Amino acid sequence: MGTATRRKPHLLLVAAVALVSSSAWSSALGSQTTFGPVFEDQPLSVLFPEESTEEQVLLACRARASPPATYRWKMNGTEMKLEPGSRHQLVGGNLVIMNPTKAQDAGVYQCLASNPVGTVVSREAILRFGFLQEFSKEERDPVKAHEGWGVMLPCNPPAHYPGLSYRWLLNEFPNFIPTDGRHFVSQTTGNLYIARTNASDLGNYSCLATSHMDFSTKSVFSKFAQLNLAAEDTRLFAPSIKARFPAETYALVGQQVTLECFAFGNPVPRIKWRKVDGSLSPQWTTAEPTLQIPSVSFEDEGTYECEAENSKGRDTVQGRIIVQAQPEWLKVISDTEADIGSNLRWGCAAAGKPRPTVRWLRNGEPLASQNRVEVLAGDLRFSKLSLEDSGMYQCVAENKHGTIYASAELAVQALAPDFRLNPVRRLIPAARGGEILIPCQPRAAPKAVVLWSKGTEILVNSSRVTVTPDGTLIIRNISRSDEGKYTCFAENFMGKANSTGILSVRDATKITLAPSSADINLGDNLTLQCHASHDPTMDLTFTWTLDDFPIDFDKPGGHYRRTNVKETIGDLTILNAQLRHGGKYTCMAQTVVDSASKEATVLVRGPPGPPGGVVVRDIGDTTIQLSWSRGFDNHSPIAKYTLQARTPPAGKWKQVRTNPANIEGNAETAQVLGLTPWMDYEFRVIASNILGTGEPSGPSSKIRTREAAPSVAPSGLSGGGGAPGELIVNWTPMSREYQNGDGFGYLLSFRRQGSTHWQTARVPGADAQYFVYSNESVRPYTPFEVKIRSYNRRGDGPESLTALVYSAEEEPRVAPTKVWAKGVSSSEMNVTWEPVQQDMNGILLGYEIRYWKAGDKEAAADRVRTAGLDTSARVSGLHPNTKYHVTVRAYNRAGTGPASPSANATTMKPPPRRPPGNISWTFSSSSLSIKWDPVVPFRNESAVTGYKMLYQNDLHLTPTLHLTGKNWIEIPVPEDIGHALVQIRTTGPGGDGIPAEVHIVRNGGTSMMVENMAVRPAPHPGTVISHSVAMLILIGSLEL
């Protein structure tokens, strides 16, 4: 019975991009580039179907390295011997496993990439083998239950790996069981649950189990199991949860989590989910037998409850989702160059649950503390680095859910000082009276000792001259005497080197017209002036900053413009100033050797900024006290405050009533009035001044007003229907905003019309919308006076107006009399009867006519209902020349009453199947004469009593119907009529016959043409066809 779908054989390639990259090292001379292995592809875990026709598995491994890397593989921690001709082949760095088997090849694989720099180890890849066996061949026992009960059909899937998906068949493929509120297929066990059975569930059931693997899908069917239903049990019973989710469900961050919950019950229970210690995300599916969390996070951890509810009660089940996580890097190591003899500290850190442990590898081997190396969990420390410490290092973080690797190369260097990559600048311009910094940065390992000279004079630190620890020469208060050659000397134990530059002194840059501070209003324009003088041999540029941040003049739609009239003018213009444009502006004029700057303050007045610190206190049922702190007035006094509220999460902000009604600008607290009890609110504050209304504050913390008794009566009170002896009352459930408190429900009062005693019923739950009162003494269609109020744990609300509701109806008890039926055509009969009297069982809706052929059983009768209280009906769609038995029953909403005595009727013979033939016509000046051969019926056809003719001389006009008892007809026509379309058919007791159609044309004075039914005169086909259809419809709709 198993079926499998596969793709044609191909090479399975499993690869992943390396998680942590490494950069290549360049030597000091920029010649040969040498760097250790950096993974570009790493193997991924493989699920290989045991029955697969694939002949090989490829585990990918590729590393970038110089010189190129060589590769080795480990299986279950042991290095593999990859010999020519064996089942395990090395192709590049990839491992190819030929004809893989579970016994020999299932396990954990790692790739090792090496070159002279060092070795790195790939992540682990697990090769697993998937399978799905066949279902047992034994016949399955029938499942028995009463109709109306819930039932479970077990799947009992065969041995398999990994998990399966399930569907169920009813009787035959592909008649799958639908996913609806009454049926549920557990994807955990495969079992089929039916909450409440009915007659349509009878049949044979088969479980379909499907395995989805990396590149194949296989399905198997179970033997059919028969579901037998005994007599219907109409009793109502409370929900009982049968498909339950575990008490604890473990999940990894990012996985999909599915909780299953399904219950038996009558009526079919409704399923609702809630998070006991939090709220459900609106993106989750929460009203079905499964709660799905598409991508679980730590915020989703907690206790969840499933509630199954119907009118008879409820059942609940709870379970906890525990979220854990694979390791994830917070901090990784990176490629590092270090000087010989120096100290180095590397660190890496990872998050995960459980907390990951960290270990270190050097060239693929475990690294432990020894001599100059100290390993402390996530820290690796080196003292006095030597050349032997160079190599490839890996930080490994792992917990029970996975392992991650971070790789880096350590290059320990010993180099003599070398200025070829970074010499001292050849020409060093400097401004008179200014300061110059001349770096000295030779490449050297270990770090070189640096000395400076001017000409032949060694420089020592003074008030004007300083050599910093990193070798930079600083000269202050520069004068012409400082011009000359300056040489940096660098030396370490590997050697020495020097580099020389020439210092040239230039005139200083000065601001000649500084910008002035200004006050402006929002939307104004302002120009800040800035002029400068400079050394004429050098270029001058202006830059502007606002509060020390550079101004971007190229930003599209920006507010800043600058003047480019002269090199010495750098004015700034602010267009349509906004509040954010206020602050400290700095104009800087600069050359390559020095700069000068001046500042100005711009104050922009505008509407107030948002208030802060919105706090709610003194929470009542309809009032709260709100306080806030003043925001920025933006240089214009605050005139007033406005308070707004909303109901999260999606409510709109609305202005609220306050005390005082008008809140002045110096206030920092006010009372909010007119709130709804037991409602969640957020509040915000908006300030205004003479220049406008500012931005609102951030929302306050969410609060809930205190509870109060309901203040509004439920609406939509109605009812009716149900089983005998029942009174069903319906109402519209009250929304959250009208509940005013917890413990919400409804108090129903009802009494028979005319009685003085009220009965009451308490219906808990805000979502409740109906109540069923059952009492055998309640007569059918008895009027009850009904009223309703709501309640919560703070008290009862107001009562609604009284409504009149009727108890359940019963079927009519009296049958119609004097039923008479007569065939009126070959396919129709008329039926008439005497009406029944309206009784106390309910409202009579109409009559149901049942009719069946003589010789058939009444169980095979067809039925037709009248839409009102008419006492006659025409039944169509009958067979010709056939005797029918007919009964009539009255019906109401509860069903149909007893049948009348049967009447008989026989339909007429069918009309002749031949149309009139040999049609001829003659035009005169004012009339048209048409003749045809009479139609003689066969013995099994009804008599011909006359003929109908449809005549149309204008395609835009409605055809005219003419009747005749003869085989000819003469009709008046205008003299200018040149052609017409005519249809002629028989009529009689059996109805109208098949039409003959002819297109007649006036041929000069008098003409005659004989109609040939095989080859008739034909106008444009579309004209004839479209208008023939119209004429047929017209003839059929007329009753003669």
From Swiss-Prot:
Keywords: Cell adhesion, Cell membrane, Disulfide bond, Epilepsy, Glycoprotein, GPI-anchor, Immunoglobulin domain, Lipoprotein, Membrane, Repeat, Signal. A lipid is attached at N1012 (GPI-anchor amidated asparagine). Residues 1013-1040 form a propeptide. Glycans are attached at N76, N198, N204, N461, N477, N498, N525, N830, N904, N918, N940. Coiled coil: none annotated. Residues 694-720, 894-919 are annotated as: Disordered. PROSITE patterns: FN3, IG_LIKE. Residues 1-30 form the signal peptide. One of its GO terms (molecular function) is cell-cell adhesion mediator activity. Residues 43-128, 133-222, 239-322, 327-411, 417-504, 509-603 form the Ig-like C2-type domain. A motif (Cell attachment site) lies at residues 794-796. GO terms for biological process: adult walking behavior; axon guidance; axonal fasciculation; cell adhesion; central nervous system myelination; cerebral cortex GABAergic interneuron migration; clustering of voltage-gated potassium channels; dendrite self-avoidance. The keyword Cell membrane applies. It is found in: Cell membrane. Residues 610-708, 713-810, 815-910, 915-1006 form the Fibronectin type-III domain. The keyword Signal applies. It is a lipid-anchor; GPI-anchor. In conjunction with another transmembrane protein, CNTNAP2, contributes to the organization of axonal domains at nodes of Ranvier by maintaining voltage-gated potassium channels at the juxtaparanodal region. May be involved in cell adhesion. Belongs to the immunoglobulin superfamily. Contactin family. It is linked to Epilepsy, early-onset, 5, with or without developmental delay: An autosomal recessive neurologic disorder characterized by a combination of various seizure types with onset in the first decade of life or during adolescence. Most patients have developmental delay, impaired intellectual development, and behavioral abnormalities. PANTHER family: CONTACTIN-2, PROTEIN SIDEKICK. This is Contactin-2. It comes from Homo sapiens (Human). The lineage of its organism: Eukaryota, Metazoa, Chordata, Craniata, Vertebrata. The gene is CNTN2.
